[in-house]
Amino acid sequence: MTTQKTVLITGFEPFGKETINPSWEAAKQLQGRELCGARVEARQLPCVFDVSLACLYAAIDDVQPDLVIAVGQAGGRPNITVERVAININDASIPDNQGNQPINTPIVATGPAAYFATLPINAIVKGLRDAGVPASISQTAGTFVCNHVMYGLLHHLACIYPEIRGGVLHIPYLPEQAARYSGTPSMALETVITALEIAIDEALKNSEDIANNGDTAH
């Protein structure tokens, strides 16, 4: 009997001056769904250094997923961006939700300088574009909690769960957020949900990534 695959998708609580976070607004819509034969489990992460990783690790232990996709908000970006790499540095320009603001500190003191996503990032971008969803590969996840979570996730998987693949997708503001900032791009929630469905589908279908699709980095 074949065991059904499971996907863990996470989104963040609101941070900064925002009252919503599109990453969680979208991710929670996938809770309990079946996509490409896999069951989706959604979990919310706090926008807090270290605590976010403790919550993520607990979720991985609980769900025992085949795939982990962490989703974050990238206000100002116009499209879905699939992160290529996470670096071993915390360098926060604003405090997290508990007032922590680490500057130039390592995420894992003995860890490598960086980890590459183990998701098929080119396949995901191509799948999104083929469906009419604007998407690109990003070469930086920043140095705030999203990068912290991506690095911590990939370090945890490499050390404890090497069979699990994972990575991070950044999504734009929702229209109701962007309306407060003149000229800021946004993406409808329904489009973001579709994008996450496609990302999961492509990741499950492609155990190996496709050739570079000519994406322009952002």
From Swiss-Prot:
Highest taxon listed in the record's lineage: Bacteria
Biological processes annotated in GO: proteolysis
Function: Removes 5-oxoproline from various penultimate amino acid residues except L-proline.
Lineage: Bacteria, Pseudomonadati, Pseudomonadota, Gammaproteobacteria, Enterobacterales
Assembly description: Homotetramer.
Active site: E83, C146, H170
CC terms in the record's Gene Ontology section: cytosol
Broadest EC class assigned to this enzyme: hydrolase
A Pfam short name: Peptidase_C15
Cellular localisation: Cytoplasm
PANTHER family documented for this protein: PROTEASE FAMILY C15 PYROGLUTAMYL-PEPTIDASE I-RELATED, PYROGLUTAMYL-PEPTIDASE I
A GO term, aspect molecular function: pyroglutamyl-peptidase activity
Keywords tagged on the record: Cytoplasm, Hydrolase, Protease, Thiol protease
Chief localization: cytoplasm
Protein's name according to its UniProt entry: Pyrrolidone-carboxylate peptidase 2
Record-listed E.C. numbers: 3.4.19.3
Gene responsible for this protein: pcp2
NCBIfam families registered for this protein in UniProt: PRK13197.1 (NF009676), pyro_pdase (TIGR00504)
Species: Photorhabdus laumondii subsp. laumondii (strain DSM 15139 / CIP 105565 / TT01)
Signal peptide extent: none
Keyword hit for Hydrolase: yes
Catalytic reactions on record: Release of an N-terminal pyroglutamyl group from a polypeptide, the second amino acid generally not being Pro
Keyword Hydrolase: yes
Protein family per UniProt: Belongs to the peptidase C15 family.
